[in-house]
From Swiss-Prot:
It holds the Pfam family HycI. It is an enzyme of class 3 (hydrolase). One of its GO terms (molecular function) is aspartic-type endopeptidase activity. It comes from Methanocaldococcus jannaschii (strain ATCC 43067 / DSM 2661 / JAL-1 / JCM 10045 / NBRC 100440). Keywords: Aspartyl protease, Hydrolase, Protease. Belongs to the peptidase A31 family. GO terms for biological process: protein modification process; protein processing. The lineage of its organism: Archaea, Methanobacteriati, Methanobacteriota, Methanomada group, Methanococci. This is Putative hydrogenase maturation protease MJ0253. Its EC number is 3.4.23.-.
Length: 154
């Protein structure tokens, strides 16, 4: 069995509108015939917790898929460089929110290739529960998958 050296992590919460983008993308990826060296994880709203437990010496590349708010047109896909991630000076651990950016930067500094595929959301409904993606973001799921498949081949 080939070792898993590419990890695709979908982040978000399906209950809060477009925040569920990453979960929708990995749900589709899980049904695809991907190379044996690729592992797909739906990390939900706990992306950092999952990454901290899953990253080992075999991982060469991590692709994180998540909804973003960069003031773009809703449904716009943006490949985000590690240097563009928010500059949070320290980790802030609590029961619900662990910033992912510092952890991804640390992984990058350790030689792991980090790719973030973000989709500009339209409706982030938290704390109000509203399952389902907006039309614009739902249309962007396949485009994100296309980009991810390209990243796997690199």
């Amino acid at each position: 069995m080939k070792k898993k050296d590419i990890l695709i992590v979908g982040c978000g919460n399906l209950l809060f509108g477009d925040d569920g983008f990453g979960c929708e993308v990995v749900s589709k990826l899980e049904k695809m015939n991907l190379p044996d060296n690729v592992e797909v994880i739906d990390a939900g709203a706990s992306g950092a917790y999952y990454l901290m437990t899953l990253v080992d010496e075999d991982i060469k590349k991590i692709i994180v898929v998540d909804a973003i708010d960069f003031d773009l047109e809703p449904g716009t896909i943006k490949k985000i460089d590690v240097d563009e991630l928010p500059n949070i000076k320290k980790y802030s651990f609590d029961a619900h929110n662990v910033p992912l950016a510092p952890f991804l930067k640390d992984l990058h500094n350790k030689g792991i290739e980090v790719v973030v595929i973000g989709c500009q959301g339209k409706e982030f409904t938290m704390p109000d529960i509203k399952p389902g993606l907006s039309e614009e973001v739902a249309k962007a799921v396949d485009k994100a998958i296309e980009i991810i498949l390209g990243e796997i081949k690199k």
